């Protein structure tokens, strides 16, 4: 027969394990829902920056502690799916594209992340981004575009503008496939 002390010791060990598992699950849920979350890039709209089926980690705290910045790659919560795009226009901005040059509030804006796409477009005899605008971004919205401008549904052509509440967070790095791990810029 087992002594009372042995029974209490086993019971205590089981309770300790149960507490540890419950704490781990609660922490995982909190981290996943409020700090960082994995997302899958769906489609080619962010090529060559991000590729179809890559997995990215998204910082979800940004929207609670600071404002979004122009040029950040964000995950947007649409009606039925999420989208990965780049913030181009901030609330209150006027966005225009003319002769493959982005203008924000009437000033030229450099887009170094488009260098490879612009070079290929020029070699193929077309512009990367069709002219549009000027578009005035309302005070509570963001204007977004994909880096693969010829193959991206975004604020120009169907997705419209997004509120801060619709932005899940900012992309920090690609974590899969493992041979492609890198920071996103």
UniProtKB/Swiss-Prot annotation:
Extracellular face of the membrane? 42-185
Catalytic residues as annotated in Swiss-Prot or TrEMBL: 45, 85
Instruction: List the transmembrane segments.
Output: 21-41
List residues in topological domain: Cytoplasmic.
1-20
| Domain of life according to the entry | Bacteria
Top enzyme class, one word, equals hydrolase
Concerning Pfam families, the annotation shows: Peptidase_S26
Q: How does it sit in the membrane?
A: Single-pass type II membrane protein
Chief location bin: membrane
The compartments listed are: Cell membrane
Give an example GO biological process: signal peptide processing
PROSITE patterns (alphabetical) = SPASE_I_1, SPASE_I_2, SPASE_I_3
Keywords for this protein: Cell membrane, Hydrolase, Membrane, Protease, Transmembrane, Transmembrane helix
SUPFAM superfamilies named in the record:
LexA/Signal peptidase
- GO CC annotation terms, alphabetical: plasma membrane
Instruction: Note whether Ligase occurs among the keywords.
Output: no
* Catalytic activity as recorded in UniProt: Cleavage of hydrophobic, N-terminal signal or leader sequences from secreted and periplasmic proteins
User: Recorded GO terms, molecular function?
Assistant: serine-type endopeptidase activity
The EC designation for this entry is 3.4.21.89
The record's annotation in PANTHER family points to:
CHLOROPLAST PROCESSING PEPTIDASE, SIGNAL PEPTIDASE I
Could you say which protein family the record assigns here? Belongs to the peptidase S26 family.
Q: What is this protein called?
A: Signal peptidase I
Species source reads: Bacillus amyloliquefaciens
């Amino acid at each position: 027969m087992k002594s009372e002390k042995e029974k209490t010791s086993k019971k205590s060990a089981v309770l300790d394990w149960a507490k540890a598992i419950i704490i781990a699950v609660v922490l995982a849920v909190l981290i996943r829902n409020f700090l960082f979350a994995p997302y899958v890039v769906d489609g080619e709209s962010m090529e060559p920056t991000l590729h179809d089926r890559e997995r990215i980690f998204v910082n979800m705290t940004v929207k609670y502690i600071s404002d979004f910045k122009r040029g950040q790659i964000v995950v947007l919560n649409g009606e039925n799916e999420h989208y990965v795009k780049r913030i181009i226009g901030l609330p209150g901005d006027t966005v225009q594209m003319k002769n493959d040059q982005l203008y924000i509030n009437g000033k030229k804006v450099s887009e170094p992340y488009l260098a490879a796409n612009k070079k290929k477009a020029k070699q193929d005899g077309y512009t990367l981004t069709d002219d549009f605008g000027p578009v005035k971004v309302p005070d509570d919205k963001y204007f977004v575009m994909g880096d693969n401008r010829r193959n991206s549904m975004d604020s120009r052509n169907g997705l419209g503008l997004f509120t801060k509440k619709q932005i899940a967070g900012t992309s920090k790095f690609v974590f899969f496939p493992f041979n492609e791990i890198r920071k996103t810029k």
